Amino acid sequence: MSIMDDLMEGRIKLYEIERHVPVDEAVRIRREFIERTCGVKLEHVSNYSIDMERASRRNIENPIGVVQIPLGVAGPLRVRGEHADGEYYVPLATSEGALVASVNRGCSVITRAGGATVRVTGDSMTRAPVIRTGSVVEALQLREWIYENMDALREEAESTTRHGKLVKIDPIIVAGSYVYPRFVYTTGDSMGMNMVTIATERALELLTRETGAHVIALSGNLCTDKKPAAVNLIEGRGKSITAEITVPGEMVESVLKTTPEAVVEVNTAKNLIGSAAAGSMGFNAHYANIIGAIFLATGQDEAHIVEGSLGVTIAEERKGDLYFAVNLPDVPLATVGGGTGLETASECLDIMGVRGGGRVHAFAEIVGGAVLAGELSLMGALAAGHLARAHSELGRG
């Protein structure tokens, strides 16, 4: 009997194939099983160049192949950061026609205007468990215990990692008899979710041993991971980034085909008032477009795109020129670990010169500049009334 026969008869499970054959053969068998079972032909999914054996150990379970997304590049983008200072080409993986062209136009404006000033204003990764006590009185006592034993909790947490540092535990929210302490770490060049989860678990072992409180879940959603949340908008998570540019008025008119005053009005009416009316926490036009395209290109955790959608765009007319800024409080990023080791992701990080250790802040500054470029271009198109035409010509439906 063949492995395929065993699969079809239910004698082995899809996840068990690698116990019998090498990874590449297991991928082929699993894919053929899906083709037979679902009545499809997966000729494109089966074509790839990445090391699937390595990926199956680190990035994927039950692999059957690879999905391909068109990859474009925007630039050069002049970035004036503390860690990234130069002209960069930004890889963007997307299936949305007109997106790369729009970001590219923004890069052109920014570079011609002297470059984007970009700063990383915050750097943290968080994990917030939920802990049960017997009453609100006990909950408040536990909160006080955490404050008083911060050094001991830090020692326990940091004993699990060479790179993670517990900066603070704040806020500590009490809701009835439940306590939600938000553990805040720095994590070096990795995104750090696994790191802070393991570190927090170790700290909680001390807490439960000393207080008798019961940890309901290692994540109580005050983190807040992979969801839009006001706590992240206010406190920050991942890399907090601000990028700004002052575009001369004549350049706004000649390149963006509009005026500084028109861009300011669109930003106020759309990004500020419109977002408030909708109850949105994204006071911007489309941060997620650029964040998503960069994340997919560079092997970031795609579920964090929703966090990168948070933030506020600022536009002001200053003596006939346009001051334009983007503020992204919550962009989890990595240049090591996770999906960054996949061959295509590594190449895309190499395009920007940010692969490997010691480069995550440079990466963050380039990301901020790219979001600024995309936001500036779209706001210019909206102010000029060109959005529908651009999508008609480049999006093609």
Swiss-Prot record:
GO MF terms, alphabetically ordered: hydroxymethylglutaryl-CoA reductase (NADPH) activity
InterPro entries the record matches: HMG_CoA_Rdtase, HMG_CoA_Rdtase_cat_sf, HMG_CoA_Rdtase_CS, HMG_CoA_Rdtase_eu_arc, HMG_CoA_Rdtase_NAD(P)-bd_sf, HMG_CoA_Rdtase_sub-bd_dom_sf
Catalytic activity: (R)-mevalonate + 2 NADP(+) + CoA = (3S)-3-hydroxy-3-methylglutaryl-CoA + 2 NADPH + 2 H(+)
Top EC class, one word: oxidoreductase
GO biological process, one term: coenzyme A metabolic process
Pathway linked to the protein: Metabolic intermediate biosynthesis; (R)-mevalonate biosynthesis; (R)-mevalonate from acetyl-CoA: step 3/3
EC number: 1.1.1.34
Annotated catalytic residues: E96 (charge relay system), D301 (charge relay system), H391 (proton donor)
Gene3D superfamilies registered for this protein in UniProt: 3-hydroxy-3-methylglutaryl-coenzyme A Reductase, Chain A, domain 2, Hydroxymethylglutaryl-CoA reductase, class I/II, NAD/NADP-binding domain
This protein's UniProt keywords: Isoprene biosynthesis, NADP, Oxidoreductase
Stated family: Belongs to the HMG-CoA reductase family.
Main function: Converts HMG-CoA to mevalonate.
Official protein name in the record: 3-hydroxy-3-methylglutaryl-coenzyme A reductase
Organism: Methanothermobacter thermautotrophicus (strain ATCC 29096 / DSM 1053 / JCM 10044 / NBRC 100330 / Delta H) (Methanobacterium thermoautotrophicum)
Taxonomic path: Archaea, Methanobacteriati, Methanobacteriota, Methanomada group, Methanobacteria
